[in-house]
């Protein structure tokens, strides 16, 4: 009986320590095509993004090869206070430009991974290996519901808790 209990305990411990497979990555990212404005369609928000409306992330390739990033949104309502944050992205070598270190405060860099990218660069999913945050982004403020559902299915397969994903209100005139 003790041997059976020890065996079961070992199996349970082994299951608890099963590593999460690596997050999928876009196979190749053309940085010049990726640059520009991206509307945040949905996310698992960071503390600064909670209540964001009309959220847009803008990327610009700097002369030194880093990526100047500006995130702007309206706080808590479409007519709320406009907020803006900047960061700098550092592309990791050997990742087909899909993995960046995103620096909001020197010298710290946050994990930033282009997990999925539409072939026409119209939609993208940005994730983190920890699966704690995710951003569904598009070149337009809205995407078809079928596309949104497919992206949620992709994220579920990647190990995300999709019940935490919230749509970001977008209204542009």
Give, region by region, the residue ranges found by the protein language model.
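Sec-dependent N-terminal signal peptides
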Residues: 3-12
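A beta-rich soluble binding module of mature secreted/lumenal proteins
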Residues: 15-173
